Amino acid sequence: MRKIKRNDEVVVITGRDKGKRGKVTRVLPDNRVIVSGIQMIKKHQKPNPQLGVAGGIVEKEAPIQVSNVAIYNPSTQKADRVGFKVLEDGNKIRVFKSDGNAIDA
């Protein structure tokens, strides 16, 4: 089970976007995540008339290391760490380390 999943709200803890918040749009297999509005890069796109793509400079999100983000805890309004807890029925859930509340409610 991963600590950071798709649609989690995260805070960037290191790098040029430190302190910014965003939603995880994709989790890549090499321990990287794509967060909306974070790590924006400019890509020089060639026009492709067959696909209907216009050329120019396109801004898009680049992947960021999962170790450089922390999950956002809405109750404390701060970045938090993720822990795991096994319920009595055998299911494993993610919890916030600071207060023990379940992330996947």
From Swiss-Prot:
Tell me the GO molecular function terms: rRNA binding; structural constituent of ribosome
The record ties this protein, via InterPro entries, to: KOW (IPR005824), Rib_uL2_dom2 (IPR014722), Ribosomal_uL24 (IPR003256), Ribosomal_uL24_CS (IPR005825), Ribosomal_uL24_KOW (IPR041988), Translation_prot_SH3-like_sf (IPR008991)
Which branch of life, at top level?
Answer: Bacteria
Question: Which cellular components does GO assign to this protein?
Answer: ribonucleoprotein complex; ribosome
Pfam families documented for this protein:
KOW (PF00467), ribosomal_L24 (PF17136)
Q: Which UniProt keywords apply?
A: Ribonucleoprotein, Ribosomal protein, RNA-binding, rRNA-binding
Q: Which GO terms describe its biological process?
A: translation
SUBUNIT field = Part of the 50S ribosomal subunit.
Q: What does this protein do?
A: One of two assembly initiator proteins, it binds directly to the 5'-end of the 23S rRNA, where it nucleates assembly of the 50S subunit.
HAMAP family according to UniProt:
Ribosomal_uL24_B
State the family it belongs to. Belongs to the universal ribosomal protein uL24 family.
Name of this protein = Large ribosomal subunit protein uL24
The upper taxonomy is: Bacteria, Pseudomonadati, Pseudomonadota, Gammaproteobacteria, Cellvibrionales
